[in-house]
Every structure is written in C-alpha cells, then in structure tokens.
C-alpha cells in the first residue's frame, strides 16, 4: 500500500493469484523477465486474460467466460461461467480454447520436468515479459 506512488483503484476484469506478481511489477514500472504464467492484470487486454484452475485430477482454463476442463485419460469438458452468480453451466466445446489450455499446462509440465522453470538467467525459459 503506497498511495503516494500508486493510485488506489479497482480492477473489475479477470485476475487470479498468479497475476499478482506481474501486476505489482507492472505498477512499479520495473522491467522484468519472469517464468510467471500470470499476467499484468492492468495492462493485458481483457480478451487475452486467462485464469487457471485445478481440482482433484482436473485442470481448467477460463477465458471470456468459457471454461475448458482437462481431465484424466484425455477427457475434455466445456462450461460457461456467469460472473454475476459465480456459477457454471453447460456450454459447447471450443477446440481453440481446449488447445490453449493444453498448451499452457503442457508447457508448464515440460518446463518443470526439464528443470527449466527457473528464475531468469542461464538456461531459463521466458514465459512472460514486461510490456
């Protein structure tokens, strides 16, 4: 909290805990390279914002109110998210969103497995960068 340096405000768009570090670094105006999968919630266009979820054996990606849910044995489901009720309902599957979800989770897995999900420096893979 530093109102002399950063004006207080409210962001109504999609953001989760993985977006905190990139957003704070963006507010501070610091150039950065990081392996974060989160995004600067104040400088990422709404149509590019995503949220990651996991529950039991499923993982999911939310974008534009649509959820791609990846389960065991390559199962895929779709859902629609209503931000007013914070509820979910049935939705048609969206191959592009499913591919994006697979890409995010597969990239994270491959980086971690190969020991390349590390802070910037020798051998690091940059996932996100400053604007």
Locate each region found by the language model.
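Membrane-interface soluble catalytic domains
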Residues: 4-131
């Amino acid at each position: 909290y530093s109102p002399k340096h950063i004006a207080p405000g409210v962001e109504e768009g999609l953001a989760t805990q993985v977006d905190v570090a990139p957003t704070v670094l963006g507010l501070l105006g610091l150039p950065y390279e990081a392996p974060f999968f989160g995004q600067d919630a104040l400088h990422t266009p709404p149509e590019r914002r995503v949220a990651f979820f996991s529950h039991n054996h499923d993982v999911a990606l939310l974008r534009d109110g649509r959820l791609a849910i990846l389960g065991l044995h390559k199962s895929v489901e779709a859902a629609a998210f209503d931000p007013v009720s914070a509820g979910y309902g049935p939705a048609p599957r969206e191959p592009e969103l499913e591919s994006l979800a697979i890409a995010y989770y597969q990239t994270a897995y491959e980086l971690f497995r190969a020991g390349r999900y590390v802070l910037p420096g020798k051998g690091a893979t940059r996932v996100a960068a400053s604007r």
